[in-house]
């Protein structure tokens, strides 16, 4: 098994309800270490760039508006097969289809306010981490 790093965003629906600690507890219970974390307000331009892959999708505008509606917590997680493990603890995008005990089943309000984002591949994780963190901020 390989030690990996992955990127996470706890979305405004989590920060607005003061659930950051509860979500972090699930992350750590899954065996992942939070090696970098900061609370930020992202700009519309940052949200559009981050989610550019979805720019042609009908939900793009709503996604961007949701992401800039309040603070987010950006994180770097580290552990054995971190990308796969975090995707499992996240749960399905649609919280109604997510397994019990996952972040989205326990905390998401809807598909649009689904509490968290996680990288889907090592290449994506590397790009997303570099977009939000300098190398000296990763203190695993």
From Swiss-Prot:
One of its GO terms (biological process) is UTP biosynthetic process. ATP binds at residues 11, 59, 87, 93, 104, 114. InterPro entries: NDK-like_dom, NDK-like_dom_sf, Nucleoside_diP_kinase, Nucleoside_diP_kinase_AS. CDD domains: NDPk_I. Pfam families: NDK (PF00334). Its EC number is 2.7.4.6. Disulfide bonds: none annotated. Its cofactor is Mg(2+). The active site is at 117 (pros-phosphohistidine intermediate). SUPFAM superfamilies: Nucleoside diphosphate kinase, NDK (SSF54919). GO terms for molecular function: ATP binding; metal ion binding; nucleoside diphosphate kinase activity. Belongs to the NDK family. Homotetramer. HAMAP family: NDP_kinase. PANTHER family: NUCLEOSIDE DIPHOSPHATE KINASE. This is Nucleoside diphosphate kinase. It comes from Beijerinckia indica subsp. indica (strain ATCC 9039 / DSM 1715 / NCIMB 8712).
